[in-house]
């Protein structure tokens, strides 16, 4: 049921009796390219009010999860990519200059937001080391006084596109962004203003916008796309719920055609190299009392589904089976006492061969970044070769990936990934197979750069897990996903998660049923909570 009454929502918001979760439901749309994806779709987005939750809607394509925001008193509508691998929100200015990204440099790979750092590593680590503990943030009132004097410049924290063609076999690589040469970089228009097709923000028409007295915002991604603009803060509305004075950047020049809503750790904000962090969306939701903890749970749903969700401040027990097991995030740099990326240890990767035998293809415990900004997954060369061998794949120079038997798309075999030594997630091999042509299938796992200190799991692996990201305590909790439309949402208190069990079960056919729910005591608030459900339409692009 769609909520049409703003007055009713206002009354509910005023009557908040406890911290409420903030939920983003995402709708999935698919097409041959981004151009054949109309805002209209045969599936109707759901806007539903629930006690104790605030819903935002996401949509999945190749895999882009796009949220619709309304910014400022003029409520300019912007659709932005939702990304766990980066931490900053930036949108397009209404009068920005669209430029083409350089496409001559093709010796770097696009891994998804939050990866592929090109900035001088030693300098960056020293600047981050000089930060106070993460509790030291620049508060909104300090921003209003413009006390921070920084130059927000960051090179290489990821890429909007994760499409990679390995043209020289394992050990060598080159990149290909789907829009380079035609629309520029990661969707840039090569000079026309089609890069505002997903919305823009006119600061002059907003009575509530305040510009920071700082140097320019500037970010560049590994595929050479970039954005330059200003920093400011304004009210941002998601469905009918408004987050007051949210900090974000407004690009006045970019080679990308869509902005980004980064919800990662504050240590990955572009301002960290200048000595401070600020409250991005998860932190601001907590600071404003909308949620009790900077925590969100991720449910991507099946590869062909039309909906999934990110739930802030709460857990949906219907969306997983068994127990949620908590794993500490890994420190990104030894010189820094806290994590910068959402990176967790993977201790084992078991692959079942066609003969039924199981092989561990991981030589030792390895750090893995969990990144919704990446469609595919990336592992080190030896791991990739072992995976390809176990699946009887053949590396193809012409295709630029491992070619596998298309029968694997219907296989019931799994890749079993052990996180932190105590939680195994079963990933269907069928989810890792991509249909390259009518008769050719490739493996959707690529080689990670040998210069990287971590591997990366994108959506084709993450959708098999129900994942809870705790940004306050630097923890990730995982359970095997249960695909279902049912819900059993509970708010998480300030003390965090204790042992919780899911109410969902998955049958051999992949459908879901519901059993009685066993929830832990402690920090899980089981009493009714009056809150808002924020539904936000997010379009996801599958480019083939």
Swiss-Prot record:
* Residues making up the signal peptide according to the UniProt record: 1-17
Q: Where is the active site?
A: 83, 371
Segments of this protein annotated with the region Disordered: 31-50, 500-519
Any Pfam family matching the protein:
Asp
Q: Which residues are glycosylated?
A: 212, 240, 252, 422, 499
Q: Return the EC number.
A: 3.4.23.24
Keywords, ordered alphabetically: Aspartyl protease, Cell membrane, Cell wall, Cleavage on pair of basic residues, Disulfide bond, Glycoprotein, GPI-anchor, Hydrolase, Lipoprotein, Membrane, Protease, Repeat, Secreted, Signal, Transmembrane, Transmembrane helix, Virulence, Zymogen
Q: According to its UniProt record, how is this protein modified after translation?
A: The GPI-anchor is attached to the protein in the endoplasmic reticulum and serves to target the protein to the cell surface. There, the glucosamine-inositol phospholipid moiety is cleaved off and the GPI-modified mannoprotein is covalently attached via its lipidless GPI glycan remnant to the 1,6-beta-glucan of the outer cell wall layer.
Please give the Gene Ontology molecular function terms for this protein: aspartic-type endopeptidase activity
Extract the coiled-coil ranges from the record: none
A single BP term in Gene Ontology: symbiont-mediated perturbation of host T-cell mediated immune response
Q: What SUPFAM superfamilies does the record tag this protein with?
A: Acid proteases
- Can you say where in the cell this protein is located? Cell membrane; Secreted, Cell wall
Q: Where are the transmembrane segments?
A: 524-544
Q: What's a GO cellular component annotated to this UniProt protein?
A: fungal-type cell wall
InterPro entries tied to this protein: Aspartic_peptidase_A1, Aspartic_peptidase_AS, PEPTIDASE_A1, Peptidase_aspartic_dom_sf, SAP-like
Instruction: Identify the enzyme class.
Output: hydrolase
Q: Which residues form the propeptide?
A: 521-544
Induction per UniProt is: Induced by fluconazole. Expression is regulated by growth phase, temperature, and white-opaque switch.
Disulphide bridges, residue numbers? 98-195, 406-441
Q: What does this protein do?
A: Secreted aspartic peptidases (SAPs) are a group of ten acidic hydrolases considered as key virulence factors. These enzymes supply the fungus with nutrient amino acids as well as are able to degrade the selected host's proteins involved in the immune defense. Moreover, acts toward human hemoglobin though limited proteolysis to generate a variety of antimicrobial hemocidins, enabling to compete with the other microorganisms of the same physiological niche using the microbicidal peptides generated from the host protein. Plays a key role in defense against host by cleaving histatin-5 (Hst 5), a peptide from human saliva that carries out fungicidal activity. The cleavage rate decreases in an order of SAP2 > SAP9 > SAP3 > SAP7 > SAP4 > SAP1 > SAP8. The first cleavage occurs between residues 'Lys-17' and 'His-18' of Hst 5, giving DSHAKRHHGYKRKFHEK and HHSHRGY peptides. Simultaneously, the DSHAKRHHGYKRK peptide is also formed. Further fragmentation by SAP9 results in FHEK product.
Q: Would you identify the family this protein belongs to, as annotated?
A: Belongs to the peptidase A1 family.
What is this protein identified as?
A: Secreted aspartic protease 9
Species name: Candida albicans (strain SC5314 / ATCC MYA-2876)
């Amino acid at each position: 049921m769609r909520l049409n009454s703003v007055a009713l929502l206002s009354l509910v918001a005023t009557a908040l009796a406890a911290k409420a979760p903030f939920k983003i439901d995402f709708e999935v749309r698919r097409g041959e390219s981004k151009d054949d994806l109309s805002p209209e779709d045969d599936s109707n987005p759901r806007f539903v009010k629930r006690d104790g939750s605030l819903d935002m809607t996401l949509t999945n394509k190749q895999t882009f999860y796009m949220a619709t925001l309304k910014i400022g008193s003029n409520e300019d509508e912007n659709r932005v990519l939702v990304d766990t691998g980066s931490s900053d929100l930036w949108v397009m200015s209404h009068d920005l200059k669209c430029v083409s990204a350089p496409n001559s440099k093709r010796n770097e790979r696009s891994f998804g937001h939050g990866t592929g750092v090109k900035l001088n590593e030693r300098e960056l680590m020293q600047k981050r080391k000089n930060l106070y503990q993460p509790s030291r943030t620049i508060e909104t009132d300090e921003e209003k006084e413009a006390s921070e004097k920084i130059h927000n410049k960051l090179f290489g924290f990821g890429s909007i596109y994760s499409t990679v063609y390995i043209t020289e076999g394992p050990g060598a690589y080159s990149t290909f962004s789907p829009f380079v040469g035609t629309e520029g970089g990661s969707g840039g228009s090569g000079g026309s203003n089609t890069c505002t097709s997903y919305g823009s923000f006119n600061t002059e028409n907003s009575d509530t916008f305040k510009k920071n007295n700082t140097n320019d915002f500037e970010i560049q991604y590994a595929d050479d796309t970039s954005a330059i603009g200003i920093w400011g803060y304004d009210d941002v509305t998601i469905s009918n719920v408004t987050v007051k004075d949210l900090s974000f950047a407004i690009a006045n020049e970019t080679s990308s055609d869509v902005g980004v809503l980064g919800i990662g750790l504050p240590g990955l904000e572009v301002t960290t190299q200048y000595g401070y962090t600020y409250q991005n969306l998860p932190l601001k939701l907590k600071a404003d009392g909308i949620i009790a903890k900077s925590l969100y749970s991720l449910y991507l749903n099946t590869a062909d589904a039309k909906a999934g969700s990110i739930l802030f401040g709460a857990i949906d027990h219907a969306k997983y089976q068994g127990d949620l097991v908590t794993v500490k995030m890994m420190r990104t740099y030894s010189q820094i006492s806290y994590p910068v990326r959402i990176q967790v240890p993977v201790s084992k990767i078991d692959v079942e061969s066609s003969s039924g035998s199981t092989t561990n293809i991981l030589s030792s415990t390895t750090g893995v970044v969990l990144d919704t900004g990446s469609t595919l997954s990336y592992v080190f060369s030896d791991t990739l070769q072992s995976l390809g061998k176990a699946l009887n794949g053949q590396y193809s120079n012409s295709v630029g990936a491992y070619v596998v038997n298309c029968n694997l798309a219907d296989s019931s075999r799994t890749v079993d990934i052990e996180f932190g030594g105590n939680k195994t997630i079963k990933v269907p091999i069928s989810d890792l197979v991509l249909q390259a042509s009518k008769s050719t299938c490739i493996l959707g796992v690529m080689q990670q750069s040998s210069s990287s200190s971590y591997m990366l799991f994108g959506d084709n692996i993450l959708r098999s897990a129900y994942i809870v990201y705790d940004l306050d305590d630097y923890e990730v909790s995982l359970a095997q996903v249960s695909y279902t439309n049912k819900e059993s949402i509970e708010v998480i208190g300030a003390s965090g998660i204790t042992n919780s069990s899911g109410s969902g079960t998955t049958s051999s056919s992949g459908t879901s049923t519901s059993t009685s729910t066993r929830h832990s005591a402690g920090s899980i608030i089981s009493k009714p909570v009056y809150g808002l459900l924020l539904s936000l339409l997010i379009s996801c692009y599958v480019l083939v």
